[in-house]
């Protein structure tokens, strides 16, 4: 009898531990709800899912349908593939719907959550965006490529694994970054210049829409001097939101004089045949200056603008 009195509690303890994947919850808490995800990218122009490389880091933030924070988890050394599964364990397992938000590529040196995720009061007050310097520029010119996604996971779609409720889903990620490779020819090699893209898209709500109030940003890069062909690269965040107002500007560093100033979407990108901002994220911009003080602007090989200029 004494042997049974000793062994039965041990057996019960082992049962509890294994039923919750080795986790023991205090005060009679339920075993966790396990949210499992396999994120992927697929634009309307892609025939099959893709799994971008170099994501490195991803944060998943989970709210209930009323906007209360239920939990979050940051994954490091992230590798996306069709076999990748990322798991978030929640002690609350009685929600009908879990609202899940994803920021992939959210490198700490480039981006920030305001307020900090652990201090989020509600979904409506959560924002995410670039770290900006005092002059409104990203702290890192070529910040990490960014992806966003969201999905509502319903408890009705769950299954039981051990004593835990498991919900599996495949969230779609949308790329939020754009690269502009600017190549300049025909300009005096010694003239110090820089390119800027000015916009209002430095910060987002957790659902991926522009934050309110909007936060202005200047994406800037100096154009190296001393060669007949000069090249630089700018990276921006998402441009296809209808409320973004990107302006492409070329300036002289020494005088501040503007050499070029365009509405990037209306005057330039909008003139590209078949332009689809949800699909296109790399743009090669050629600025060809001529001795007659004219400039021709091409994007991805298409001439989108030409006119006379004085400087």
Go through each PLM region and give its residues:
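Intrinsic-disorder/low-complexity, polar/charged segments enriched in Ser/Thr/Lys/Arg/Asp/Glu/Gln
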Residues: 32-36, 83-87, 166-168, 179, ...
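Bacterial N-terminal signal peptides that target proteins for export
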Residues: 1-8
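Acidic/polar, low-complexity intrinsically disordered N-terminal segments immediately downstream
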Residues: 22-111, 118, 270-311
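C2-type phospholipid-binding modules
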Residues: 129-135, 257-286
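Tryptophan-paired
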Residues: 58-114, 191-272, 311
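C-terminal motif of bacterial Sec signal peptides marking the signal peptidase cleavage site
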Residues: 16-19
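A sequence/structural signal for flexible, mid-protein segments enriched
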Residues: 130-228
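Short, low-hydrophobicity acidic/polar segments
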Residues: 71-174
């Amino acid at each position: 009898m004494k042997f049974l009195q000793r062994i039965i509690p041990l057996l019960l303890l082992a049962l509890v531990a294994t039923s919750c994947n080795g986790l023991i919850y205090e005060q009679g808490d339920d075993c966790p709800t396990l949210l499992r995800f396999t994120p992927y990218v697929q634009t309307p122009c892609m025939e099959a899912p893709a799994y971008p490389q170099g994501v490195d880091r991803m944060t998943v933030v989970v709210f209930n349908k009323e906007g209360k924070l239920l939990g979050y988890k940051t994954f490091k050394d992230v590798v996306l593939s069709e076999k990748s599964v990322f798991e978030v364990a929640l002690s609350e397992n009685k929600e009908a719907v879990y609202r899940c938000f994803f920021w992939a590529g959210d490198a700490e040196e480039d981006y920030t959550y305001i307020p900090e995720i652990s201090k989020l009061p509600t979904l409506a007050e959560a924002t995410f965006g670039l770290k900006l310097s005092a002059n409104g520029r990203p702290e890192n010119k070529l910040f990490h490529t960014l992806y966003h996604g969201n999905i509502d996971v319903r408890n009705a779609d769950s299954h039981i694994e051990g004593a835990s409720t498991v919900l599996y889903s495949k969230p779609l990620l949308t790329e939020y970054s754009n690269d502009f490779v600017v190549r300049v020819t025909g300009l005096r090699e010694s003239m110090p210049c820089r390119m800027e893209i000015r916009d209002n898209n430095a910060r987002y709500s957790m659902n991926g829409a522009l934050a309110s109030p909007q936060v202005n940003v200047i994406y800037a890069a100096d154009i190296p001097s001393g060669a007949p062909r000069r090249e630089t690269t700018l990276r921006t965040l998402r441009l296809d939101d209808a409320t973004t107002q990107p302006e492409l500007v070329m300036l002289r560093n020494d005088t501040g004089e503007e050499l070029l100033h365009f509405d990037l979407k209306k005057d330039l990108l909008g003139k590209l045949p078949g332009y689809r901002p949800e699909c296109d994220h790399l743009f090669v911009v050629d600025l060809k200056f001529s001795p007659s003080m004219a400039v021709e602007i091409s994007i991805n090989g298409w001439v989108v603008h030409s006119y006379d200029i004085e400087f």
